[in-house]
């Protein structure tokens, strides 16, 4: 088991949680948003850096990391301007296809913001759901009966010294029926 702590790195247990060992203390990041174990190879672990919250005290990250050996070593796989990664999903059909939901920078527009997809295990990334310069993707799920169907939640947000501005026209739900290549807005 693994756990990624918002401002406390990555931890691993081999005895059902009785004891935990830090496995990323020697990395350049401390802030994490999500962790995903590849269902095709449990030694392959994907890690999204940057806390998955919108508070003023939030820690930022520097992209997506991959461990091929159960957390012994880590390699940055890109999206260094994402700052806050909220979800990583490995395709149940293909270990080379990975989706990364990125909220992007909290204090400024742009960055690596949206839903990113790789079909070459992180060598290249394509932004497949980009709404606007203030809107990122905060959650993603794959339909368990048809893995070509995905649902994404977007969140338009901006923080300044005085306030957190959340919501707005970019906040919505989206659906894809072609494995994340195209998206349409769900009207609720």
Language-model segments: residues:
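Beta-propeller blade termini and top-face loops
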Residues: 1-188
